[in-house]
């Protein structure tokens, strides 16, 4: 089977209707700029933000419609980065008695940022 490029395809009929519903869902409160940074309560920095950006980008490619909040979300997420350029705490392997003492890396932080990189 030969795949169809979404550059040359605009979904119509049931598929178009479903794509429209999904695009509308991505404009709900939890995917808006004012809340997207607060949605991850499970300790996966970059995960919710990245999945949101990726979903908006892919939906725009499919529907050929500009997402309402994409650029604003990207701006907010990029502004929230720490001084090393990523979201969440800095793990530097030092032992200062804090919650990140001795940690060099956080698996959830790495995984969450993979979604963010794909979306950007």
Identify the function of each model-found stretch.
Residues 1-51, 55-58, 66-95:
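Low-complexity, Ser/Thr/Pro/Gly-enriched N-terminal "stalk/linker" regions
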Residues 96-103:
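Acidic/His metal-coordination segments adjacent to aromatic residues that form catalytic metal sites
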Residues 44, 107-108:
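Structural signature of alpha-solenoid helical repeat scaffolds
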Residues 47, 111-114:
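Residue signature of alpha-solenoid helical repeat architecture, marking inter-repeat boundaries
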Residues 54, 115-118:
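Residue-level signature of alpha-solenoid helical repeat scaffolds
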